[in-house]
């Protein structure tokens, strides 16, 4: 978007500043250590579409030929930019559930490719050539070699090769190494005097290429970084028009990488042991003192620039490796106390300067800038004094006026007359009082661009001024709050770290009542990492006797995840839960990979042209840039469209016809008058409210050519470049319009005089002066870019590469943010019927009953139903006694005490298994802990072999031809050429008619 400056003018956005260094990774959080799941099958390498062609570089000049003047020396090479700092580690996913399956073999980590060198210095701009037609599409570049692999891990057994799966997700880019030491900037040599230009000689043959300089030793490989989260696909950019290939700049040196950290000890897999209590958390150790930086390495000699090699074809994708065998399950270790943090080591000495990397491909063409505002016209200066009049000629005899004749042909240009003396310059008038500001007039038409003047002498580079005060604008009102964002996706499962040493086993206390959930405290400092070894598993005890059935205990801890049961019948869909409150913002994620370029969006509507603003103050001249190497010859441009015809002026009133006077002598040219005083600037307008961000409009018309900038300093003398290829011949120019007729009316024909004597041949005429170069016409509009051609067919798949070796497991990442509570699951199907239990032991033998009727006891209270006892043996039947008389009914007695509980009966048969209970709600995930300390970087493995180059795809169809480009601006007027040789004398003309008699 465009802003408004203090004077109400539209400010064009400046170029984007350089990216700041990336911060160091934060420490990992103290979250629980998750177990690693089985590794996914490796995806096939994707073959993404080739990005759009970069913007054209500026056309270079032809090298000096023959005995030409000395070329300027090339500018000094700037110091290499610092290497970016290591990126933040990506956030790890939620810890996985502890399973009974063993750890699977890890795939070897792919080494990071070395960082690309800094972009070379831009080439010096060549002469403005006309834009050429679009060239054929170049061959795809050679596929880069893969980076060094990680250290060789224990290789699992090769499994059977599975079917080719879909391509896997793109892995995150590893963090760049630590920045290398910046080399000292060499002192600039003295500026040599510019030699006089000699005559243009015959173009010489290109000399043999110089010997290549010794390449500096390569820097240490960068450490493998933490995997970062994949970034979202960027918005589709506007495809730039294809341009000419720019000159390849020198590559910067590669900075040294940090030393690899030590590899942690791996625990021996053992049998599952009992889970011990968690040890106490250790106090963090003191921070070590940072050591002094090491000395800077020597700068290698720069070798001669070699000829570019042919572009290779992309190699075939590698074959997908088979899955590794699963390892033995490891025992659940007990988390031990964390040791103190180690001291920070002093940085090592800077490595030797690496060999320069290849230059990166040019970026996409940026959007054309907005058309500049038309400046206010300057006030006309006062007229100069008129020179003294020349001597009046003698009046001729006026002839009879003849009829107006037809327009004659343009006569031969006569010899130029002598230049008159310059008139005296007039005195500058006094500056008048500034008048009131006038009303804003309508926007004037764009004036024609003037011819470019000759470059002035190089001025000294000015010092940078102090930063000006802040403008009088006020801060905009805050916008409305946006809608809440979507919940983040759960992160990927982290890699398991090394097992800690077992802590001391404490006595198990009684389980208390569950208390209320307290407020979460601030996260404590991250403790050091334990380094103990795995303990031996304990012996399995003998099964104990079965005890009596106890009372139901409190709800136990969540058990380990059991094996997956049979799929239950689908239940009814549950009601969707309420949306929870928005959680606290998580830590800043690592920068993602650059997304693929999307299709070009439709062109937006043409924006309205803004009102012309006040003329701004001229800014100070910027510092002179370094002189770049000469670029390649540009191709001739296409013919531009004819410009619009100018508007016809108003016809003036016809004046009276005056008598035809004799032509007077040529007067002296008056001196130009002084420049008028500059008007005072109007008051600044009020700052408006910030407008809404508009859509990107179509490219506006090209602006007028700006004034030439100050010339840069004379560069160092460079070597003679190779001879460029001869460009195609340009189109012939159009025939210019006929010149205006000469002054004066056509005279009446005179009478024929007598033939005179043949005259002698006249003296040889002098060569005419060089005519003034005419003003350039208005620049035509730029044509629309042609449609892109179809993409070529993909290359055939090459042979598979060798499978990589397994790398060491990386450190565990912090747990992810808490996700929303899940919906209740569907009711599962009833489980299978259980097996019948074992028969219980026989109960004790019952007492033998007494014979005879007992006395009627008081009715006791019903006791608790005891278990069914064993059937007693029948006693001997007693003799029947005489029946007594019936007594009176007594009152109801008091309730007797409960009788003793009978012996425990035999265990009954196992009943049918009950229905499976409804699945409970899923608990809330824990909050994310603070990031833990960065893990030690893994060792970089050897570089894999590059695959063979695939066949070249068929060429794409040619795109539709674009409109004719614009005519380039006229170059500066060159120095006067050598004086031509004297022409040969022409043949003697025929004798003239005789003259009049004397």
Curated annotation (Swiss-Prot):
Superkingdom of this protein's organism: Eukaryota
Expression across tissues: Expressed in bones.
Biased composition (Gly residues): 318-327
Modified residue annotations for 5-hydroxylysine: 98, 263, 338, 564, 675, 845, 907, 919
InterPro entries in alphabetical order: Collagen, Collagen_Structural_Proteins
Signal peptide (residue range): none
Post-translational modification 4-hydroxyproline, affected residues: 25, 28, 30, 39, 42, 45, 59, 74, 80, 89, 95, 122, 125, 131, 140, 146, 167, 176, 179, 206, 209, 221, 227, 236, 242, 245, 260, 269, 272, 284, 293, 308, 314, 323, 329, 347, 356, 362, 368, 377, 380, 389, 398, 404, 416, 425, 434, 437, 455, 472, 478, 484, 490, 496, 502, 514, 523, 537, 543, 552, 570, 585, 591, 612, 618, 621, 630, 636, 654, 663, 672, 684, 690, 699, 708, 711, 732, 741, 749, 758, 776, 785, 788, 794, 809, 815, 821, 830, 836, 856, 859, 862, 934, 937, 955, 970, 976, 991, 994, 997
Posttranslational mods: Contains mostly 4-hydroxyproline. Proline residues at the third position of the tripeptide repeating unit (G-X-Y) are hydroxylated in some or all of the chains. Contains 3-hydroxyproline at a few sites. This modification occurs on the first proline residue in the sequence motif Gly-Pro-Hyp, where Hyp is 4-hydroxyproline.
Biased composition (Pro residues): 166-178, 653-665, 808-818, 853-868, 988-998
GO CC field: extracellular region
Region feature (Disordered): 1-998
Annotated Basic and acidic residues bias: 62-76, 904-918
Residues modified by glycosylation: 98, 919
Subcellular location, record wording: Secreted; Secreted, Extracellular space; Secreted, Extracellular space, Extracellular matrix
UniProt keyword terms in alphabetical order: Extinct organism protein, Extracellular matrix, Glycoprotein, Hydroxylation, Phosphoprotein, Secreted
Modified residues (3-hydroxyproline): 698, 975, 990, 993, 996
Ranges annotated as biased composition (Low complexity): 9-22, 112-128, 146-164, 212-251, 371-397, 406-425, 484-493, 597-611, 624-651, 680-696, 725-734, 746-758, 889-903, 937-970
Miscellaneous notes: These protein fragments were extracted from ancient femur bone collected at Rampart Cave in Arizona.
Assembly: Trimers of one alpha 2(I) and two alpha 1(I) chains.
Family that this chain belongs to: Belongs to the fibrillar collagen family.
Protein name stated in the entry: Collagen alpha-1(I) chain
Provenance organism: Nothrotheriops shastensis (Shasta ground sloth)
